[in-house]
Structure formats: structure tokens, C-alpha cells
């Protein structure tokens, strides 16, 4: 797992209460508090247990396919004419994204706690697929809550989950997206607290989830750091990742937070523009509040009602962000910027045609920012981007927009 942080480190959070500065914490129903505290105790034991680490590492190697490669995007670099661009190829993992890293870790915890049923929420369906996958691997029943809107736009992943034996429950409340799915999952958890483990897919939710998810995803940055040192003999100048709830981003960022020479940029979903409500840029255009068990930046109105965000990418369509990102934003260690739907779409097509890699729409947002920045950087500079998921799930969405048909 992680190397111990240095004193005065950006990597030492959260505190015992699960706070990163004023963000994080655990704001949950009384019925859930004993379970949350049990989970926290089990997590504290597990992360110091050599047998747990060994099992996690073994599954990482033989089931997920780690380490994922670091790939020099030669043609994209030449086309942009600036910094060298490297991708951390998380889309090559089993199930096609970074989500499996966290799911394997959490299902091992669920087994340790004696839980007999798994529930999960999903937006793009990648976390749902990864949850259904690990539930099948360990022989546990799995229920996945998914917004009705997302069920429609992510049909291939819905079919995958069902094939894997999971029950997919469409949620029609609100806009029928990730926030609404998470609300339903929390309701289920309160009702079935003794038997059920809630496998949260992003670095948000009540403590210890943000810390736990980050630590399971930190393998991305740990590997990438070693790989870039082997490839280039030095660290990158810039690390970039897309941010929805923020698990793939914190996974690659965490290892680099204490490296002063490394600039770090998180890319939010700018949707149709920040002047209206059709975006999901919580840090750029939101304000602090409490949602889903933690204090963080949210898209909310003057009365504290959560707004319904929008993104072309189902995985970024969440009106909040993990609390560690909120803190990193406020202290200025990480810069967060929005990318619009149309920019992500262009980046999606660029990568597909230049490198023969079809990216998911989520990392296409990060790629759009890389495409903007690379030409302004020197040819001796290095950009590292997390290519967090593959785009198979998005081909129909993109085809529809581009008028390609089936």
C-alpha cells in the first residue's frame, strides 16, 4: 500500500475523524454509525495485516492484470508538437477501468466482516460492472443501483452486470443519475445494515470510505511513478486526471503530492458551460455543503438544495467531489479546471484516430486539457495522464452525437 508520509506532508490526511481540513467527516444516520465504526476498525486492522496485503497484491497481479502499462503516445505527442505525453493505461485492467482496484479491496473487507450481500451505486456502469465482477468472484449476491437516465445511456454495462448475476435497480428519482443512485443505495444500507456491505465506488461518502478508496487506488500513482522514472529518469512536469467523485484522480495524484516540481491538474465536467446549470464542475462553480455522509464542494442553490448537474459522461455526472480533492483545491496544491462536452468529444476522436485507443468519455475530459497544454510546453517536458477507462461503453452515445448511426 502507501509509503508512510513525511512530516508536514500533503499525504498524511485524513485525521481520526476522517477530515481533510474542514472537509470529509461522517454525517450519517444513527443506525449506520455503528456499522461505519466497525468498518473503520476493520479497515485499520486490514491495512496493517500482511495476509490482507498479500491477497490484495495476488489478486491485483493475477485477476486485475497489474501493473498496468505506462504508454508513450508518440503520434499524439508529434501532432501537438510540445511536451511528451504518457498514459497510465488503467483501461487495460480487467473490466476496463480503474474501478476494479477499489472493488477487489473492498470485497476482501466485506468478507472479513462476514457480510453476505453487496450493494453498489453506479453512474457510467463501470463501478457496477466491477462490483458485480468481484461479487461473482467471491460468490456473493449483488444489487446495483443505477439512475434510470444512466441505464438508458449505458446499455452495454447494464447487460454486463446482469450477465455477471447482479440485480440492476433503475432509480427514477431526481434526474435519474449517480446522485440519485447513491441516495437509494444508502436507503437500502440503513434497512439491511446487518447483512449488507455498501461498496462505494468513488473517494467520497462518510469516513473511512474516502481514505479507503484512495488507498486502494493509490497503486496507480505508485506504479506510474516507478514506471516514469524507468522510462525518463525523472518525474513528470504535469500530472492530469479527470475528476467526478475523484477516485481515479486521487489514485494517480497521491504519490506525487509531496513532489514540489510536479504540477497536478484535475479536470471537471464543464458540460454545456459554467454559465448555466448544465455542468458538474463542483470545485469551479460549487460551494461547501454536506452530501452522502461528507462535507465537500457541491452544486447547490441558495437554500442548500442539490442541483441536478449534467455531463456527456455518466461517470462525471455527480454534483459533488471527494473531500480530499476539496481540500487540495483550497490549499492550492492541485489546480481544478472544467472541460466542456464538445471538447471531450473532440479529444475522444483525436486519441482514437492517432493512437488506436478508444478512451472512455471520462478520461477524454483529461485528454482535452492535455491537448490544450502540451503545445505550450517544451519538448523536453513530460505530461502523465491517467487513462482511467476504455470507451466501449460510450460508442453509442458518441455515434448518436456524431450522426454515425449503428
Curated annotation (Swiss-Prot):
Gene3D superfamilies: 3.40.50.1100. The modification N6-(pyridoxal phosphate)lysine is found at residue 99. InterPro entries: Trp_synth_b_CS, Trp_synth_beta, Trp_synth_beta/beta-like, TrpB-like_PALP, TrpB-like_PALP_sf. Its cofactor is pyridoxal 5'-phosphate. One of its GO terms (cellular component) is cytoplasm. It catalyses: (1S,2R)-1-C-(indol-3-yl)glycerol 3-phosphate + L-serine = D-glyceraldehyde 3-phosphate + L-tryptophan + H2O. Pfam families: PALP. Keywords: Amino-acid biosynthesis, Aromatic amino acid biosynthesis, Lyase, Pyridoxal phosphate, Tryptophan biosynthesis. Pathway: Amino-acid biosynthesis; L-tryptophan biosynthesis; L-tryptophan from chorismate: step 5/5. It is an enzyme of class 4 (lyase). Belongs to the TrpB family. NCBIfam families: trpB. HAMAP family: Trp_synth_beta. The beta subunit is responsible for the synthesis of L-tryptophan from indole and L-serine. Tetramer of two alpha and two beta chains. This is Tryptophan synthase beta chain. The gene is trpB.
